[in-house]
Each structure stands twice: as structure tokens, then as C-alpha cells.
């Protein structure tokens, strides 16, 4: 999912990091900060550093499992490995495992601007099947 405005970026970050969804923040990880304000500030600073304040602000992926198929610890490990492998440490990101439903699921929000090169991430139709699903399959299978 594309995040198109600054307020949408902050709201999405705040939503996935909500304590009541993550067992008091137990299941939150990433490389951009420990609270929504810090993560947002880091992402916006990267955009400012590269002069890329316009356009999409970030991306939000959700990875979910069927009820009973995964526990929070395993889901955390999967999202941590996915973030490291897919984003390669080049994008600011935060991920969170939500345990407030009958099925475990994780959210990843990452900056639209690469903090190393300054290029913007491009997501095109079919990229999930071609590039993203193979990474999750490799980690999960």
C-alpha cells in the first residue's frame, strides 16, 4: 500500500506501533526509532536530506498467517529477516507484530526514499509476486 501524505505516514506508523496491538510494544522492531514520533522524524529527515519531500511518503506491507499457523516470536523473526533482506538496510523502516486478532500478522512501513542513494522506491504491479513473495517464501519455508 502506498502512503501518500505526511499525515498518512505518521498515522500509519502510530497505528502499527500501538501498544495494545503489540503486547505493550514487545513486538516492534526496525532501524528508524523506538516510538512513532522518532520513526516519522527519521523518515522525514531522510527525505529532506535528499530533497525528496514530494510524492509518496512510504510503503506499508502486511504479512499474515492463518490462525494457529504462526506465533508472535516466529512472526517477529520473519519480519526482521524480511526487512533486512528485502530493504538491505538502505531504507528507514519499522515493523510490528499485531497479536490482538485471532491470526498473527505483521506490518512493515518503510520510507519511500533510499537513505544511501536518495533514489525513490518504485513498486509496480506484479512486484509482489516477482520480488517480494519469493523473499517471504525463502524465509518461511
What annotation goes with each model-predicted range?
Residues 1-141:
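N-terminal nicking endonuclease/strand-transfer module with a His-rich metal-binding environment
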